[in-house]
């Protein structure tokens, strides 16, 4: 292959991009391919798709077009789900190693992007009793997801038309599950997902909280009384009330989970920059972990900030 000079005046000793073999310079975006008169292939648009991923599934989820291409929005969605899968896959493998099969419940499933991708990448080739349950309040989404699972032969998937709160007592779900996920379950639905996970003795919980309005509403209601404490400056202004309430909600959730014996990891999702709700909370149950200190801190925070009326929402185990 013909080569150009190996250095440029501004970068001595460093190969310029065009100094590389032509085959290394051919990764162009579709628009540049068109300008260069090159054919635009489906592969040029789908290089992000994981090996073994069902193309039919990606088309059904409208991540790929009918001719197998991908636009910027669908590329972003796929990147988000794949990034989240990197966190969930080890939890799935640990549960499978421990119990031989995995039961996962996805709350606020929506169109079940996450559930379908998880099943396609992890579950479909394993011939065991593993199962994914998608919980969703919109009946039309439950129906369409059920039909898609049947069409793809994903027999280990079920979709239930329930609220997160109603699912706790539902007999359609097993008495115990391994993993609970809740992505952007609005406002208190995330707290209901936590209660569900605790009731079902889940080994792992994966949360991307959303719309934490309840705590902010209580802060706003009690603001006049709280202003005697200089700490109330943290939420005196309306914008700060909303932002502080959002962060405080997640802090209280983390303390609640720690009080129930979970080890917490809190991080930021990469590729979700378009959304301000990109905080990822992963909780793994650790038998024998200290529980008294996080429970004490949780109660003191509720009292100090004037949120005692939310004690039932952020319930902790009774201490001996």
Feature map (PLM): residue ranges:
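Serine residues within intrinsically disordered or low-complexity segments
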Residues: 7-8, 15
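Class I S-adenosyl-L-methionine
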Residues: 32, 40-59, 66-67, 73-75, ...
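Intrinsic-disorder-associated, low-complexity terminal segments enriched in Asp/Asn/His/Tyr and depleted
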Residues: 10, 18, 22-25
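Conserved class I S-adenosyl-L-methionine
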Residues: 100-110
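Conserved SAM-binding loop of SAM-dependent methyltransferases across substrates and taxa
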Residues: 111-127
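Conserved SAM-binding motif I beta-strand of class I
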Residues: 131-136
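Conserved alpha-helix/loop element of class I SAM-dependent methyltransferases that forms part
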Residues: 80-100
């Amino acid at each position: 292959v013909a080569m150009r000079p190996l250095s440029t005046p501004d970068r001595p000793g460093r190969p310029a991009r065009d100094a590389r073999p032509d085959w290394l310079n051919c990764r162009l975006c579709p628009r540049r391919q068109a300008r260069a008169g090159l054919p635009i292939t489906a592969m040029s648009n789908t290089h992000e798709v994981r090996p073994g991923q069902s193309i039919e599934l990606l088309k059904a989820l409208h991540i790929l077009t009918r001719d197998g291409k991908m636009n910027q929005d669908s590329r972003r969605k796929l990147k988000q789900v794949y990034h989240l899968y990197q966190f969930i896959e080890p939890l799935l493998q640990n549960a499978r190693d421990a119990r031989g099969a995995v039961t996962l419940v996805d709350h606020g499933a929506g169109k079940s992007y996450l559930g379908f991708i998880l099943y396609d990448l992890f579950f479909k080739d394993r011939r065991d009793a593993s199962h994914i349950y998608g919980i969703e309040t919109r009946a039309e989404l439950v129906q369409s997801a059920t039909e898609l699972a049947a069409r793809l032969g994903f027999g280990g998937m079920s979709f239930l038309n329930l609220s997160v709160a109603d699912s706790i007592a539902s007999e359609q779900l097993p008495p115990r599950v391994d993993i609970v996920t809740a992505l952007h379950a609005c406002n208190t639905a995330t707290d209901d997902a936590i209660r569900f996970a605790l009731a079902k003795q889940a080994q792992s919980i994966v949360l991307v909280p959303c719309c934490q309005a309840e705590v902010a509403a209580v802060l706003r209601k009690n603001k006049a009384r709280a202003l005697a404490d200089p700490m109330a400056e943290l939420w005196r202004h309306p914008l700060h009330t909303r932002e502080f309430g959002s962060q405080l909600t997640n802090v209280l959730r983390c303390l609640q989970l720690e009080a129930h014996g979970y080890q917490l990891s809190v991080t930021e999702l990469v590729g979700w920059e378009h959304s301000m709700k990109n905080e990822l909370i992963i909780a793994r149950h650790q038998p024998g972990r200290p529980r008294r200190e996080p429970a004490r801190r949780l109660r003191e925070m509720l009292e100090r900030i004037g949120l005692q009326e939310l004690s039932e929402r952020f319930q902790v185990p009774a201490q001996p």
